[in-house]
Design a protein with these regions (language model features):
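Conserved GNAT-fold acetyl-CoA-binding loop/helix
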Residues: 16-44
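A short helix-loop-beta-strand connector motif used in the catalytic cores of GNAT acetyltransferases and
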Residues: 44-55, 81, 137
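Conserved beta-strand in the GNAT
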Residues: 55, 61-70
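A conserved beta-turn-beta hairpin within the catalytic core of GNAT-like acetyltransferases
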Residues: 71-82, 92, 138-139
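Conserved acetyl-CoA-binding loop-helix of GNAT-fold acetyltransferases
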Residues: 87, 93-106, 133
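Conserved GNAT acetyl-CoA-binding A-motif
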Residues: 101, 108-120
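Conserved beta-strand-loop-alpha-helix junction that forms the acyl-donor binding cleft
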Residues: 117-127, 144-148
Length: 148
């Protein structure tokens, strides 16, 4: 496998690689199964709210997807938050996730971020092992109150 990272959006959230956005949908839906039928429309709203996307590609095929944002707050300073990180199930344990994480870390460092943060579902033990191998630590609990 010959991996490369393709930046799908620019720093303003504009889609600069629409063909790669379209190719990302299948892999992205393997993590986010409730995404609406209008995938491009949903992602346009995410990008308008500060989200960015890159994909890991093997040739012309998307094998991993990352959606992230850079923001500043009072408790973590300037940080990168990873909304979504997913690897094609057929390509797990082949360096795809590591390639995306290394790219995200470079982007975060170049932007002056103090942290790279993400949340992972409590049931995703394999993902947790991966994040620990990537040098991440648990620093807080994440609480959610459903509103409807």
């Amino acid at each position: 496998m010959s991996l490369r990272v393709v930046t799908v959006t620019d720093d303003r959230g504009a889609v600069v690689e629409p063909q790669w956005l379209a190719r990302a949908e299948g892999v992205h839906r393997s993590l986010r199964t409730a995404l609406p039928a209008d995938y491009a429309g949903k992602l346009a709203r995410v990008f308008a709210g500060g989200g960015r996307m890159c994909v890991a590609a093997d040739g012309e095929r998307v094998v991993g997807v990352a959606v992230y944002r850079i923001s500043e707050n009072t408790f973590a300073g300037l940080n990168m938050y990873v909304d979504d990180l997913v690897t094609d199930e057929r390509e797990r344990s082949r360096g795809v996730g590591h390639t995306l994480m290394a790219h995200l870390e470079r982007v975060a460092r170049d932007a002056g971020c103090e942290n790279l943060r993400l949340d992972s579902g409590t049931h995703r033990q394999q993902a947790h092992k991966f994040y620990f191998r990537e040098g991440m630590v648990i620093t807080s609990f994440s609480f959610t109150k459903p509103l409807g």
